[in-house]
Each structure stands twice: as structure tokens, then as C-alpha cells.
Amino acid sequence: MKVSDAAKRIGVSTKSASRCFDELEYLNIDVLGMKGKSRVINIPDDRKQLWQQIERVLRNPVIRRFVLREDMKIEKKAGISALCEYSLLSDNVYPTYAVTKRELKASGVKVEKQVSELEEIGCVVLELGYFIDFLGKGFQDPLSVVLSLTGEEQEEERVDISINEMLEEYVWSKD
């Protein structure tokens, strides 16, 4: 897949996709090749092995985490709430939503009151550097879900099982 095709597929500019290719090259991740004069990405058949190779160098897409008093009822689900949509895991009593850096101001998240330690949580909103709507249903993509989860969330056995189920069904087994 060429840089321009990759950019279209994930909904970013060609320049952003080119920077991603540059980072892959810099990190010495063996997925880039040349087709004529164009750089191309060649995803190996064993996606799970590739993920295990690159997960340690990928950045968490979460820029900031807002823990709010009121449920903002935002359409995009992220983090643990998105994981629940992909698996049989039950969600927290409060949902986790996503807004991109661009959407943050218009969403009103910054003016909402954050909870103190003793208050009940209405929702969690993750400000993300990017949001890939994986199934066109407003759910964060599975790989970004894994990167977005806190260490505490990932340590829970039920969450770990759900992560593995999600990756197996939506990522490793996909054509």
C-alpha cells in the first residue's frame, strides 16, 4: 500500500501518513518496501507477531483524560467502553468517550466540572490525538483501544481476556 493509499484509508493527510512511514523506517520495523519510486507498506500475514514487535514503540493516543460529573453522551466510544462493544465485557457504571484534539473545544468537555475523589463519575472523556472509527459505528479501533487503556485497567484479568478476544476476532483473523 502506497503512502497516499494509506492516508486515504485511515483518513489523514498524505503528509501525516508519510511521517508515519518515516517513523516506521526510523524504528527499523521491517514493513516498508519500494514499488518503483514509491514507498509502500507490506503488512505481513502474521499480524499478531507484527503487533508484538511494534507495540512497545507505539504511543498512547490519549492526550488528556477528563473525569466528569455529568454524562456528556458523546457519540464516540473509546477505551474500556469501546472494548466492551467488541467483547462480552460489561462496561463500567460510567461510559468512556472520545473527542479528538480538533473537537475538544466544540464538545464543551473543558468547561464541564471534573469530579473530586469522593464524587460519583458521570463519564470519562479521552482527548485523543486521532480517532479511527473502525466499524463506522463510533467505536475506537481495537489497536488504539489497547493503547488507550490505563495500566490499572489492563491488569484486570477480565479486561485482559476481553482484549485477547477482541484482537483475535477483529484484528488477527481479518483478511
Regions found by a protein language model. Name each.
Residues 3-8:
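Residues within the helices of the helix-turn-helix
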Residues 22-26:
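Residue-level detection of the helix-turn-helix DNA-binding "recognition helix"
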Residues 32-50:
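Short, Lys/Arg-rich nucleic-acid/phosphate-binding segment
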Residues 52-175:
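Long, low-complexity, charge-rich intrinsically disordered regions
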